[in-house]
Amino acid sequence: IQTVFNPVNIGKNPRFVSVIPARKVDLYGRVALHKGRDNVISGPMELIDSFLGAQISKNGRVIFGLPSRNMDKKPNFKLSIEKFHNQFGFEESIDMVVTEYGVAMLNGLSIRERAMALIEIAHPDDRNELFEQAKEEKILYPDQIFMLESSRLYPLEIDKTVSFKGGLSIRFRPIKSSDEEQMRRLFYRFSDESIYYRYFHSLHIMPHSKMQEYLNVNWKNTMSIVGLVGEPGLGIIISEARYLVDSSGESAEIAIIVDEKYNGLSPKYLRF
């Protein structure tokens, strides 16, 4: 045990991934740990050693996994787990939380961004209550929008990494409500000319109210795919392609925006 769970030895292995079973997660990103007989990690010290080893490891990751609900069909995602025992005390260092509904990349996010990312991977029947609780506690903006029906239709199966010439790899996935800050940064990287051609009028700011309306997609008639570069959880959005089917259902409007640093990507979107 002392050899296997030595964080220095673990850290010598590049890309070491520590997968830790969780019992509960709250919207602040805090985790209550799961304890069971079948765990490889037998105690809290081994867990901390595994965690520290992943932190030391080059490109290492710490992933917490849990089902969205327990065996009694009660939610494992809470507004707060402050009163739960066996809490993990390094929530700022958690890279990912995984459920059967997706992955929340938490690295470097604010509390508000964490809350939105975690709500997106909670059980669909629990999301609206979590959202309203987060607004009441002022974790989210008072005017924050959340389209419950659209969240149920999120096309989780669309997720693909494509390699391009020059060693460039881009991950394509559907846009999320929690992409607000990333999409705002992308907007401010555009020239005035690019903004005009995309939105057909001049825009100098992209406030929260306007951006969140754009991000809350009605998946029944709209598709929005973003492209990300960089390590998972640390990547940045460099592009978005969107189509909107008209009311007749016979035609659609298509718009593609690409970070000017990556000009030439638009034709790849059409093939994707």
Language-model segment annotations:
Residues S151-F272:
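Long, contiguous binding/interaction regions
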Residues I1-I145:
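Conserved phosphate- and dinucleotide-binding cores of soluble alpha/beta proteins
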